[in-house]
């Protein structure tokens, strides 16, 4: 069967939820038995989001094969079973870098390099490559139609529609249909102008997803269809909802999946959304609630911890609990003391980079350990837990990470480049080296120690989790820390690197070097998060007695 392409664009304003809409449609099509994948084309000049500020761009989502990608790929994996790869996300910067590399290599035989055809051809080639092996590929274009940055992508998709045939392509455009209280009605003019902008570059949308705070009345949908040259049944109303997991059912109720299948002449069974109905039932009927304190340095933008936020909610679903997240700036712990941590049922310290707020995180780990509060540390959250234990229990009073103090006397955490690879080679880095591409990235094996809490939670000896870090636990100083009682319960594939630590004689204190949040989904909560939230609930019940 030929691959079919759905191109998703957005107009009027940004942040309409193109990624959620694309993922929701993909979930319905997958529920009809189709093999679906989703791609994200980002129009910024950065080669990838790896070195971008989390407070500007949100989290960096790491794929199984180690690509540092846009957070929308996290949404995609949470909605569909297909795992994303480095083929599922690319940027303007990556496209231009590749074209310039080919030009320097002489691939273009001295031709003048231009946006059309060289840049657009590179975009088309990557979209086609990413679509291989799938029945349907949904391609989301970042940004807003009318922005100069996205023009090469839109032109490439216009060309691709001609190349593969319009019978195998569908353009889906998200727009804003605002409600004006003084007029007492929704206004369609912004949508009309957004479609006009698309038409000016040669793209006629086939489906319009109309975002609003309410359902669009039938007469307004008919008006939009008439002025925008779209079938009335293809004007879909997408109102604000309490949970993003309601959106697949909302789109299906308006026949979007039927329209898509008819357009592509696909014969497939009705979508079975039973799993999503179960998710929504659990979400609407919790038996209790917990408050998790998330202590980090990017707390002013919750999207910086998007996958962690979602994983906590998924763990709530697994345990039939409502999870409330209290964001705590780690610098507040330094300046105001541990008082800011009181009233939470569990404490989570997520990943991060840089020295700012680190001492606050270390005090947080100490507070959780000494007060028997359930603690989950992720990546840096594991490293600071190790530093805290080394300082306050193992007697290594000057313990630190070489990330925060290059000259520290007791570097219990050290640069990844100080470790030898399988061939005995050590990578050399200087102050001039690029930050990009210097980390342990992607899915890697981990061996769990028998009898440990981690082994009990996972229910198996070997697991695979995703990494994104430069620093490792220093094996030279580790024996002294273990002698003081800290348990190493997870080791890398070669059993040389620490992956999980646990504090004994504590209700629940687990920290991991990897990022478990990247593999959590609403249908399959992650064992570590599920165990953590359950322990937090047990702590909550004690506190209210």
UniProtKB/Swiss-Prot annotation:
One GO MF term: metal ion binding
Say if the entry is tagged with keyword Metal-binding: yes
Segments traversing the membrane: none
- Active site per UniProt: 379 (nucleophile), 515, 517
Binding positions for ATP per the UniProt entry:
15-20, 72, 239-241
What enzyme class is recorded for this protein? ligase
Q: In which pathway does it act?
A: Pyrimidine metabolism; CTP biosynthesis via de novo pathway; CTP from UDP: step 2/2
Residues the record lists as binding L-glutamine: 352, 380-383, 403, 470
One annotated Gene Ontology cellular component of this protein: cytosol
| Assembly with partners or alone | Homotetramer.
Listed NCBIfam families: PRK05380.1, PyrG
Name of the featured protein: CTP synthase
Q: Which gene encodes it?
A: pyrG
């Amino acid at each position: 069967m030929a691959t079919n392409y759905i191109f998703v664009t957005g107009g009027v304003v940004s942040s309409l939820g193109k990624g959620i809409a694309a993922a929701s449609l993909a979930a319905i099509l997958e529920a009809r038995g189709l093999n679906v994948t989703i791609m994200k084309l980002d129009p910024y000049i950065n080669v990838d989001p790896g070195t971008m500020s989390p407070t500007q761009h949100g989290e960096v989502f790491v794929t199984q094969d180690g690509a540092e990608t846009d957070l929308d790929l996290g949404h995609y994996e949470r909605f569909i079973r297909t795992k994303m790869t480095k083929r599922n996300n690319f940027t303007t910067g990556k496209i231009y870098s590749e074209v310039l590399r080919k030009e320097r290599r002489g691939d273009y035989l001295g031709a003048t390099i231009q946006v059309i055809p060289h840049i657009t051809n590179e975009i088309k080639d990557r979209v086609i490559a990413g679509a291989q092996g799938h029945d349907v590929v949904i391609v989301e274009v970042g940004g807003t139609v009318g922005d100069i940055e996205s023009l090469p992508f839109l032109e490439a998709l216009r060309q691709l529609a001609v190349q593969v045939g319009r019978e195998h392509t569908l353009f889906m455009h998200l727009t804003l249909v605002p409600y004006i209280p003084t007029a007492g009605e929704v206004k369609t003019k912004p949508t009309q102008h957004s479609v006009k902008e698309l038409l000016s570059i040669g793209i006629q949308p086939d489906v319009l997803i109309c975002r609003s705070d309410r359902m669009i009345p039938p007469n307004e949908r008919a008006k939009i269809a008439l002025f925008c040259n779209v079938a009335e049944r293809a004007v879909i109303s997408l109102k604000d909802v309490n949970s993003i997991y309601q959106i697949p059912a909302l789109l299906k109720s308006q026949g979007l999946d039927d329209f898509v299948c008819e357009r592509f002449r696909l014969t497939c069974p009705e979508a079975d959304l039973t799993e999503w109905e179960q998710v929504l039932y659990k979400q609407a009927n919790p038996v209790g609630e917990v408050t998790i304190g998330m202590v980090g340095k990017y707390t002013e933008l919750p999207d910086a911890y998007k996958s962690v936020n979602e994983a906590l909610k998924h763990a709530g679903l697994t345990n039939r609990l409502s999870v409330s997240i209290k964001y705590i700036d780690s610098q507040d712990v330094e300046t105001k003391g541990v008082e800011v941590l009181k009233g939470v049922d569990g404490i989570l310290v997520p990943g991060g980079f840089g020295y700012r707020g680190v001492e606050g995180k270390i005090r947080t780990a100490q507070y959780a350990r000494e007060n028997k509060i359930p603690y989950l540390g992720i990546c840096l959250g594991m490293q600071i837990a190790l530093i805290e234990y080394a300082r306050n229990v193992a007697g290594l009073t000057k313990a630190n990470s070489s990330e925060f103090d290059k000259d520290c006397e007791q570097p219990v955490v050290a640069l990844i480049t100080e470790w030898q690879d399988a061939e005995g080679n050590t990578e050399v880095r200087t102050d001039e080296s690029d930050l990009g591409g210097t980390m342990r990235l992607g899915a890697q094996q981990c061996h769990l120690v028998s009898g440990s809490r981690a082994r009990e939670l996972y229910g198996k000896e070997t697991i695979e989790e995703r990494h994104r870090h430069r620093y490792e636990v220093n094996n030279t100083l580790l024996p002294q820390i273990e002698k003081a009682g800290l348990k190493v319960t997870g080791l890398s594939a070669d059993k040389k690197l620490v992956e999980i630590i646990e504090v004994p004689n504590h209700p629940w204190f687990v920290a991991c070097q990897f990022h478990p949040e990247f593999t959590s989904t609403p249908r399959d909560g992650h064992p570590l998060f599920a165990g953590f939230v359950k322990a937090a609930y047990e702590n909550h019940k004690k506190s209210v007695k």
